Amino acid sequence: KTEAAKSLSDLLSMKLVRFDMSEYQERHAVAKLIGAPPGYTGYGEGGAGSGLLINELEKNPSCVLLLDEVEKAHQDVLNVLLQLMDNGIVSGSNGKSASARNAIVILTSNLGAADRERAKIGFGDTENVGVQDEAVKNFFAPEFRNRLDSVVKFSKLDRDNIDNITVKFL
C-alpha cells in the first residue's frame, strides 16, 4: 500500500508526505499535527509549534499525503482528519490554517486483515468475505466514511510478489 502511494507520487511528480499514524496513538499527539494549544510549550512559536501537518501542507500544497496505518491513530487525530476531508483545510491550534485542496490524501489501514485470514468453518467460501468492509464500518464514524472517495482493498501478497519486492530493494 505504501509502495503504491510512492509510485503515485512519482508518476504525478508530486512530493510524498508520509505520516506514520502509529506515532499518534496518544490523545496529546494531535498537538504534533496541528500545534500546541494555548498555554503549552511551543504555542505561537511558528515552525514546529504550528504542527507538522500544517507545516508540510504549507510547504507542499500539491502533494500525495500518506497517512499510514490510520487505525492506530487516536480518535482526536481522526477528528482532525475529518476536518481536513470536510473542507480541504486544516486549522491549527494557533489559528494558522493550511489547504489540502490540491493534495491527494491516502489513508492506509490493516482493518479486517486478521479476521479475513481466519478460515471459516462449514461449507461454502473458505475466506471471510466482507470482513474488511465490516471492520471499516465498525472503526470509522459514518461522517468519516462518507468523506472517503473510495476504499481500495489489497490482497495478501503471494510468494512471487514477495520475491519481486525483495529483488527490487536489494
Give residue spans per PLM region.
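AAA+ P-loop NTPase nucleotide-binding core of proteostasis motors
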Residues: 1-170
